[in-house]
A protein has these predicted regions:
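N-terminal export leaders
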Residues: 30-35
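Sec-dependent N-terminal signal peptides
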Residues: 36-40
Length: 333
């Protein structure tokens, strides 16, 4: 440039380097705006990640745990009957029907454990796959039980639904779950099978450990009182005698005559090991223990897992807790 303006014009390089822009932008924005933006991005990311997973509904907490084990990172599991809740007396809500409609697979125990499941599935309009986890399990039958469709005045042979109390049955459960998941998510079939077989090894170890623990108790001392008859499969597998004021479900209260007979049996057989279950009303068993002169032990987990901060948050934890408490109680007999 020439002329009179040449001396008055000065060129300055704009201060707009990348570093200066970044520094200015971040320092100028309010801290709470930055944090809110980061939180929103993280939430969007987690929602997108969850959307990629297979939605599965399990009828109750023990099944929910098994589905999570087999499904791993490929599934997101919703449980209808949660921790410390009683599936025998569960009443479905409209929200439960909505849950089914978003599921690709519904997993139930079967053997009459969830008498409400069929009605809920039909009422919800769910058209997807339903898996009965007890497929292939040899059911234990009991004569004279009332409930789950029995009617007063008639003999009724009822299948005991608590098949998970024998780890060998749970091996069938997880293999059935693996097959059910693979049916609706063929791409994950290898993963599901591998997870199931790895868990079967843990179940075999649990079975061996339980046998070793029970073996420390003399055979004539292996007697226990529990709230309801939920341990029949455990009893058959490990040679422990269980007595209960209630049958295989918790709906029907025992009569005064039945309670009196049980008290006499407890006293006659000198049973000191008495346990209440986490989802049962403890008043009956506590009074029974007092009247019979027995010792009330820690809670057992029969039909439901515990919350995460309690000792029965998973199936394996539940079983090990139960065995430990049972052995301690039977030592008092």
């Amino acid at each position: 440039m020439s002329g009179p303006l040449a001396n008055s014009f000065t060129y300055s390089k704009p201060m707009t380097t990348m570093n200066s822009i970044d520094t200015f932008s971040l320092s100028a924005l309010p801290r709470r705006f930055i944090l809110a933006s980061a939180t929103a991005l993280a939430l969007l990311g987690s929602q997108a990640f969850a959307a990629d997973k297979l939605p599965v509904t399990a009828s109750f907490s023990i099944l929910g745990d098994l589905v999570r084990v087999v499904g791993g990172e490929r599934v997101v599991v919703t449980t209808l009957v949660g921790a410390n809740e009683d599936a025998h007396v569960f009443e479905a809500k409209p929200a439960d029907a909505k849950t089914l409609l978003t599921s690709k697979l519904v997993v139930i125990n079967g053997l009459g454990f969830e008498p409400w499941a069929g009605k809920l599935i039909k009422a919800s309009g769910y058209k997807g796959e339903t898996l009965v986890a007890t497929k292939g399990v040899k059911p234990r039958h009991m004569e004279g039980e009332q409930g789950h469709g029995a009617h007063a005045g008639h003999a009724h042979e009822e299948a005991d639904p608590h098949a998970w109390q024998n780890p060998n049955n749970v091996a069938l459960y997880v293999r059935n779950i693996a097959a059910g998941l693979a049916k609706v998510d063929a791409a994950g079939a290898v993963t599901y099978q591998a997870n199931a077989e790895a868990y079967v090894k843990e179940l075999q170890a649990l079975d061996a450990w339980t046998k070793a623990q029970i073996a420390t108790i003399p055979a004539d001392k292996r007697k226990v009182i529990t709230s309801h008859d939920a341990f029949g499969y455990f009893a058959a597998q490990y040679g422990v005698k269980f007595l209960a004021p209630q049958g295989v479900n918790t709906e029907a209260e025992p009569s005064a005559k039945q309670v009196a007979q049980l008290i006499k049996q407890i006293q006659r057989e000198k049973i000191r090991a008495v346990f209440v279950e986490n989802m049962s009303n403890p008043k009956l068993i506590a009074q029974l223990s007092k009247d019979a002169g027995a010792t009330l032990g820690a809670s057992l987990y029969a039909d439901a897992l515990s919350n995460a901060d309690q000792p029965g948050a998973t199936y394996l934890q539940m079983m090990r807790h139960n065995v430990t408490q049972l052995v301690a109680g039977m030592k008092l007999n």
